């Protein structure tokens, strides 16, 4: 699909963040909360879970404030090729995501893409 890299990231990133937080909260929540405190200026007293979720929403809000399209559907993309896209990510990009920040497999990639519709 003909989407610039930055726009694609703006669409996918909040959904990737939600996926990571849901699937590996013990590791991800402190990192996202730290991002919220150190980059977005959140109050650490609000707690890790609150700040992690707020960081995701604030990130999505930031992309919206730039006027960036928020869904893959806005580009005429549906789920027809999500399986192929997931396979491409796993083979043509960096490969094994099972040991990443929040492990992501083929089904996880499809879940993130679907949430981005």
Predicted regions: what is each one?
Residues 1-58:
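Active-site segments that bind and position negatively charged phosphate/pyrophosphate groups
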Residues 36-117:
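C-terminal charged capping/lid subdomain of soluble metabolic enzymes
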């Amino acid at each position: 699909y003909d989407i610039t890299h930055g726009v694609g990231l703006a669409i996918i990133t909040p959904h990737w963040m939600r996926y990571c937080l849901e699937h590996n909260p013990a590791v991800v929540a402190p990192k996202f909360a730290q991002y919220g405190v150190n980059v977005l200026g959140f109050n650490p007293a609000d707690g890790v879970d609150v700040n992690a979720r707020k960081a995701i929403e604030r990130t999505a809000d930031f992309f919206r404030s730039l006027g960036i399209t928020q869904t893959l559907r806005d580009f005429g993309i549906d789920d027809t090729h999500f399986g192929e896209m997931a396979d491409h990510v796993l083979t043509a990009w960096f490969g094994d995501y099972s040991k990443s920040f929040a492990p992501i497999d083929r089904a996880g990639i499809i879940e993130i893409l679907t949430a981005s519709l």
